Regions:
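Surface-exposed, charge/polar-rich loops and edge strands
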Residues: 1-347
Length: 347
């Protein structure tokens, strides 16, 4: 499909700079029924049914943006994928300032050797720390890798270190938040539990590729960055049991959905999963594992707007986004969300 089909005009003032407070006070455009309804997130338990299963992503965002030097030249890097112990692929700016074999220096105790350079401003860095020591150094010296459309002077501030983390966050490794999870509060989770709605988490370490623009003219020519994900045997069994009993699988965010679909067989059975996925979902895809999706409002021409168009229907999503813009919904990572029902399942 032509990428231009997924374009739309979005006024700059519709882009949220900070999350709603409290988080479950964010607005929610409900498309789970025939009519479009304006709701708020804390109404979610009233819409879902007892026996439904809510699947969230428990990845934790690391402060993956670093400001340092190569010699006297200032360089900024954003880590986006771990390749080995202490070794990460990163986007460097300006990449031309880094040369293979030289040192990217943050301070006297934190530095990395440039192992390789790739296309598109990517470099491979080997740090002088690994494991928990590397995470501790990132927490101390790094800043949150906020999307470029959220404006900050020098990257994420201290408030963003909590704002840009979901209530489900447990496992270090993401460099972008699974933003649909940002809407949940302890009170909302308690209300979901009281309603008899089951909850489990899976893990997909979101990479910075989620922010990359689609530069090709046709979706057939776009290549996704791969991301590592995991679904345990116990959770795979519960997903299959839920659907067999007539319950619905509700994915919290596109990252959860992409991982579930990556783990699903053609007959819809979800299998345990621990691998990389680069699944790219566009209209025409038949969904195997997910019945409903809670997701934020996405960028024009983005792979995520393509995904929701595939999930709920292209024309329906165009109408929904027009409604959201007209009614002043807040867009992107810190913005409001929509609740979608799948319109394109396997037979």
């Amino acid at each position: 499909m032509k990428v231009d089909l997924f374009d739309f005009e979005l006024p700059r003032e519709r882009i949220a700079e900070h999350p709603a407070s409290p988080r479950d006070a964010a607005r929610m455009l409900d498309l789970s029924a025939a009519d479009i309804q304006d709701r708020i997130v804390r109404e979610l338990p009233d819409i879902l049914r007892p026996g439904d299963l809510l699947i969230s992503n428990d990845t934790r965002v690391i402060p993956a943006r670093l400001f340092g030097k190569r010699g006297e030249a200032k360089v900024e890097v954003t880590l986006h994928k771990q390749e080995g112990l202490g070794t990460w692929v990163a986007f460097a700016k300006p990449a031309k300032k880094l040369r293979i074999g030289e040192t990217f220096w943050v301070n006297d105790e934190f530095e990395a050797e440039v192992l390789d350079k790739k296309d598109g401003g990517e470099v491979v860095l080997r740090f002088n720390k690994s494991g928990a020591d590397l995470i501790a150094a990132l927490e101390k010296y790094g800043v949150m890798p906020l999307p470029p459309y959220i404006r900050r002077e020098t990257g994420g501030d201290d408030q963003d270190k909590s704002d840009y983390q979901t209530i489900f966050a447990q496992k270090d490794g993401a460099v972008a938040a699974p933003t649909a999870g940002l809407h949940f509060t302890p009170e909302l989770l308690a209300n979901l539990d009281a309603r008899g709605i089951n909850r489990r988490t899976i893990t997909l370490h979101v990479g910075a590729g989620t922010f990359l623009p689609v530069k090709v003219d046709d979706t057939e020519n776009h290549k996704m960055h791969s991301e590592w994900g995991s679904i345990s045997p116990e959770i795979a069994d519960l997903i299959n049991e839920t659907r067999a009993n007539g319950g619905r699988v509700v994915a919290v965010g596109t990252t959860s959905l992409r991982l579930l679909e990556s783990a699903a067989r053609e007959d819809g059975v979800v299998e345990p999963f621990e691998a990389e996925t680069d699944i790219f979902i566009t209209p025409g895809y038949k969904f195997r594992a997910v019945d409903m999706l809670l997701t934020n409002f996405h960028l024009p021409r983005s792979t995520l707007f393509m995904l929701v168009s595939a999930f709920a229907g292209f024309e329906r999503m165009k109408a929904a986004y027009a409604h959201a813009i007209e009614n002043e919904y807040r867009f992107y990572s810190y913005g409001d969300c929509s609740l979608l029902e799948c319109a394109s399942k396997i037979d």
